[in-house]
Amino acid sequence: MSQGEIVQVIGLVVDVKFSIGKDLPDINNALKVIKSDDDSIILEVILEQGDGVLRCIAMESTDGLRRGMKVEDTGSSISVPVGPDTLGRVFNVLGQPIDGGPEFPADHPRSGIHKEAPKYDELTTSREILETGIKVIDLLEPYLRGGKVGLFGGAGVGKTTIIQELIHNIAQEHNGISVFTGVGERTREGNDLYFEMKASGVLDKTAMVFGQMNEPPGARMRVALTGLTIAEYFRDVEGQDVLLFIDNIFRFTQAGSEVSALLGRIPSAVGYQPTLATEMGQLQERITSTKKGSITSIQAVYVPADDYTDPAPATTFAYLDATTNLERSLVEQGIYPAVDPLESTSSALDPEIVGQEHYDVATRVQHILQRYRELQNIISVLGMDELSDEEKLIVARARRIQFFLSQNFFVAEVFTSVPGSYVPIKETIKGFKMILDGHLDDLPEDAFRGVGPIEDVLKKALKMGVTPSDPEAKALLEK
């Protein structure tokens, strides 16, 4: 392997000079700086400066680096452990365990984090729904198996909570493998997630990779690729259907922006890196389904200042099959998950994919909620008394639908002391159809809040002293 030496250190940017005439390390190669016998730092080659000088980004703190230190070319990009042994473990960007468990032996299978996306003839085009057990998602923005989903929302509206619930439901109900990638988020959240998953018994079905907000931008920029590489092994070698969670894809863009500034590139719109679309494409094009297996990706997207036209979320939109938009006004009303049923979308909400009944119920729900939103302006100015009887009925049913879209989560049990619920798609459709058809008009609104299937509404109403008068509702209660 060729050797060079450090000629300049500017924060996290390190310039390394190699002898002219010898083979220079390739772009994206990992270089190793040996600080002492038991301490080294990994750099990644970003660009060539000329005269044998390569500009690199450090994956760790550059404390202690100085000019003249020897640097070795590893001959490949950053390589991380792959395979079934990664399940139940926690890694950093370099694939090193950070959970206090045993190190992986030198001969353990590894894979480089930089790869080409699958070729067109390797891709599959089947369109199948992935049941999540979350009513608002399954009804109005169903997720495709092997698709890409964006969870959009500002700070503190529940993106990470939905991701945790999805991991729980997929592991418990589908026995599926998940890879969780924490990109630039709070270390506390990662710590909580690890222990919650351990307690709920789903950790042994999950590999976790973290590059948190206290780490250098180089690590935060590459950690998503580390998680993706682990997921690709399960798809390509073991032929599995994998869920890849990225929390948060905005921090991936943000880290790229920091690296771009450190490299001295001229910024683009709103101060983002000029290579924003390219970097996003290199990541997203690898997240796909092949004839061997699938990767279903669920990505939390922080929206700066709730501005959806910001280049970071706007660039992400282009790659998504479904969007789940979280709305702060619903949080203020105490409706969880705070998913906006009218702004959230899915390309899978098509009668040929979900079936005619599902499609009809979903569009009727959207129509009645849209009409309610229009009537709210009249109500806020003139009050309910100015509405016609038909409009009052629309408002009453819309409010019941809005509350019935809320649901208790398994992962929130420790905070709420209320058991979570998993609702199959068939039960979800049945419940909303009964509300739309007027079978539950005589039940109080509060009975619909924070429940699972429609049977829970009837039981809750009974506890409140209200017995349904509708024959269909009575028959369901007797069952």
From Swiss-Prot:
A single GO molecular function term of this UniProt record: proton-transporting ATP synthase activity, rotational mechanism
Cellular compartments per GO CC: plasma membrane; proton-transporting ATP synthase complex
Catalysed reactions, as listed in the record: ATP + H2O + 4 H(+)(in) = ADP + phosphate + 5 H(+)(out)
Keywords: ATP synthesis, ATP-binding, Cell membrane, CF(1), Hydrogen ion transport, Ion transport, Membrane, Nucleotide-binding, Translocase, Transport
Enzyme class: translocase
Record CDD domains: ATP-synt_F1_beta_C, ATP-synt_F1_beta_N, F1-ATPase_beta_CD
Compartment(s): Cell membrane
Enzyme Commission number, as recorded: 7.1.2.2
Entry binding sites for ATP: 153-160
Membrane topology term: Peripheral membrane protein
Subunit structure: F-type ATPases have 2 components, CF(1) - the catalytic core - and CF(0) - the membrane proton channel. CF(1) has five subunits: alpha(3), beta(3), gamma(1), delta(1), epsilon(1). CF(0) has three main subunits: a(1), b(2) and c(9-12). The alpha and beta chains form an alternating ring which encloses part of the gamma chain. CF(1) is attached to CF(0) by a central stalk formed by the gamma and epsilon chains, while a peripheral stalk is formed by the delta and b chains.
Function description: Produces ATP from ADP in the presence of a proton gradient across the membrane. The catalytic sites are hosted primarily by the beta subunits.
Family: Belongs to the ATPase alpha/beta chains family.
The protein, known as: ATP synthase subunit beta
Lineage, top ranks: Bacteria, Bacillati, Bacillota, Bacilli, Lactobacillales
